[in-house]
Amino acid sequence: MLKLLLIDGSNYLFRAYHALPPLTTSTGEPTGAIKGFLGMLSRVHTLAKPDMAAVIFDAPGKTFRHEMYPEYKANRPPMPDDLRVQIDPLEKVVAALGWKVLIVPGIEADDVIGSLSAMAKREGVKSVVATGDKDLSQLVDDDVVILNTMNTKFYDRAGVIEKYGVPPERMIDYLALMGDKVDNVPGIKGCGPKTAAKWVAEFGGIDAIRAAAPAMKGKIGENLRAGLPFLDEAVALVTVKCDAEIPGVKSLADLSFAPGDA
């Protein structure tokens, strides 16, 4: 069966930047993130052996999530200058190597990945999502697996359950309960991975947890009841969009490798 590789370029970029010591050209231009990224790209291509592929980056500017919740990602520090200046040349090099580079304004890289994986299902193609972002685990099913950037392991449904304690179809509930400090999404105070997984295992989704909240005892019960008003918004913020139109990609044929690419 044909296979589509979707690379979370923004996630890879930051990991590459922090993985290597600062490197520069003879004229002082930083290149460490570029070098690290290209090495990771080569490794993941070898591991996944795709027939089609795309590297997806976040677009600059705000997205529909900022419209839903203006404080979304408000606590993030600005991108370091020595990383920012590497983005444009990196995108050009990746494209020159034969990869399809996608940047879609108004949505995040996660949403492009989700929408392309949905397109792949419609076309009968399996997807490999290369990322270190736990949010994308919600996409995993019989047609989608995660290739973790940290340990180069593939995670199917059983792998997601083993790693997080919840199945992929409950990852949205799990993520909403915990919130996300990096993205400034409030969760239930004091609810970490173990508590979130316990509630999901015991009660099920957010609606069932909400129904059980009045009977929950102790401080964590108080925290849950206090956080209930925001839970629906948290669910919306952590849900990956899977129905976005991707400019330049009408079918997976637009993501095919030509002979000698990559």
Where do the model's predicted regions map?
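Short catalytic/ligand-binding loop motif for oxyanion handling, primarily in non-cytosolic enzymes
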Residues: 63-65, 137-138
